[in-house]
Regions:
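Structural signature of nuclease core domains in nucleic-acid processing machines
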Residues: 1-292
Length: 292
């Protein structure tokens, strides 16, 4: 089977400044929030510090685990030995056992791909690429037109913060946390460290959808899938969007103990991806006036 993979991480700064003040594309949590453990309270992933630095640390663990090989860290004792020094270096030694248990849950959680029992720890390195780079040109692409298209055809057309008027010029580039292949279908997987609440129940489908809308992750996963669409189109002779694209997996990692595992699956319609492909290629496109 053909795999695409080369090395590198997401930016999406090109669209960041088009959001109203206080809203940012592809942003998890900007504010650091540390709530000390009360005496006798056991650490849990729901109590782990929040903010950019802890979020980057959690993302980094998954990136390193991918490089190590997810399967190699499924052994609990090996995972603890691997994780402990990394926590110590950050001054989070008291969280080492908690994070080791949490990482084990992530690796062993079935249902990574919808309709399957696949777990992250079962993926061989030949079936995924961590931090995959993408890049494509933009010439006077209307940001608000992108916004209208994406809003109409994702998340049931629900309201979300609008992008400000502007045009994209130059190279649009970024990095995808993980691209994986399973049974001939390709998925983009993005790790999210957002804190949605203090319990597993706070990571409901509705809560995750609200987070997607609030942070405009719809734009993020649409561009990821556009990049994947273009790469597969170039490398698979028989490529077909409906057959080969599995969609976007958003993993709200603090909710791994929720009934749904904190996993959110989105798959925009072929029409949207192909329309955006033409738009970035400088071809005229028609507006889409229906929700999907």
């Amino acid at each position: 089977r053909v795999l695409l993979f080369e090395k590198r991480r997401l930016a999406a700064q090109e669209l960041e400044e088009r959001l109203p003040k206080g809203q940012r594309v592809a942003d998890d949590e900007r504010q650091s929030r540390f709530v000390p453990l009360r005496r006798g309270e056991q650490p849990s992933i729901h109590r782990f510090p929040r903010g950019p630095q802890p979020g980057t640390f959690l993302h980094g663990l998954l990136e390193l685990a991918a490089q190590e090989g997810f399967a190699t860290l499924q052994d609990a004792e090996r995972c603890r030995r691997w994780l402990a020094p990394r926590c110590q270096r950050r001054g989070w030694g008291e969280w080492s056992d908690c994070l080791s248990d949490w990482l084990g849950q992530l690796l062993q959680r079935p249902g990574l791909v919808p309709g399957t029992e696949l777990a992250l720890g079962e993926l061989p390195p030949s079936r995924y690429q961590s931090e995959m780079a993408f890049m494509f040109a933009a010439s006077k692409v209307d940001v608000q037109q992108i916004d209208r298209l994406v809003t109409a055809m994702t998340l049931d057309g629900q309201p979300r913060p609008a992008l400000q008027r502007d045009r994209l010029n130059g190279l649009f580039k970024g990095y995808i946390d993980l691209v994986l292949e399973h049974e001939g279908r390709y998925y983009v997987l993005d790790y999210k460290s957002n804190w949605l609440g203090a319990t597993a129940a706070d990571y409901s489908e509705a809560a995750m959808s609200r987070a997607l809308l609030e942070h405009r992750y719809d734009l993020q996963y649409v561009f990821y899938l556009l990049a994947l669409h273009r790469q597969l189109q170039a490398r698979l002779p028989d490529y077909d969007y409906d057959r080969h694209i599995g969609g976007a997996l958003y993993w709200f990692m603090r909710g791994v103990d929720a009934e749904n595992g904190g996993l959110c699956h989105q798959r925009p319609p072929r029409e949207l991806i192909e329309t955006l492909d033409r738009l970035f290629a400088g071809q005229p496109v028609e507006e889409i006036d229906h929700a999907g």
